[in-house]
């Protein structure tokens, strides 16, 4: 009798589990990706050579030889990935879904370690939707370059996935987006290098507001981002430690456009980027005043102007062109102390990407050639850190990519 009761109970549990599963649908996906690349000289990079930003300046040794004028290259499969999309039962009138996606990039120098790319739930009421979790930063958005390089247009295009709470309203072609964001893998620069502590100590999340209008074949939009960081909470002067109250706030804006038909894809975006180092862009801030007793500092953020254009044609054979340009506009005030950021010694960067890919169902094989020019010079702190008397440095990058998706 006991055995019969256990059997009946197990069958009931199996029926209940099966009934619950009927309310869910699952879609597994992924890709194996190999990146083979060559650079003619050393470059500023994110983590490894797969994520290229711009060429480094001349660094002379004792014999007057350029230490950075050495080629490099490698072959990586770190950005292969696995993911799952789940459609769940309704919560009230809201459709529910979630996404989990990971690759093997790891973090820092810990390569070939599983890393979360996306992890979020989404509640969709039709016109309104709320997303909670980690996904693409809204500055990355729906308009981003179609290219082979993993940088996807950085440092001209924001590149970032962050924990966030996002509200989106869609009606009659209009799409309104509001997000509050925190930092996890993509971090702001500051006195202790790149760290989460600056936004954590701020207690104020990053804020984004944007609007898009869509019609068949077209999308246009604009957005604004606000970031407020606390660089330090204490400082030491002559062996004495003082509590300090510091904050640096910045506002960035962007506008974008996209056209697509059966064969053509044309996109462009322009930004006024202020202290967007957490998005793999150039930027940061500098010290404008220092309290002589406590060492407490005030700051001014740098402003960078960036723009890019991307054109891709075809279906099976896809030639493409990407053009990116950025300019260091400096800070609004004279600087009297240290600067913190990425690429603050760079005046301009111009990059061209020429790509050709062969596409089949589940397969992509492509090659890309990318000459990149950076201008360096003398940093004038009294002029807000702007660069004068510049000279140019060029890197030639060749990339081969093989991708199998499922």
Segments (PLM) and residue ranges:
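Outer-membrane beta-barrel proteins
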Residues: 39-43, 109-111, 141-145, 185-190, ...
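Detector for outer-membrane/organellar transmembrane beta-barrel domains
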Residues: 217-346
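Transmembrane beta-barrel outer-membrane domains
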Residues: 21, 73-79, 111-118, 156-160, ...
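Short, small-residue-biased leader/transition segments that mark boundaries at the very start
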Residues: 1-8
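Extracellular loop and loop/strand-boundary signature of outer-membrane beta-barrel proteins
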Residues: 67-70, 105, 148-153, 188-197, ...
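Outer membrane beta-barrel
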Residues: 21-48, 58-186, 203-204, 208, ...
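Outer-membrane beta-barrel "beta-signal"
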Residues: 360, 390-406
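Boundary at the C-terminal end of the N-terminal hydrophobic targeting segment
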Residues: 14-21
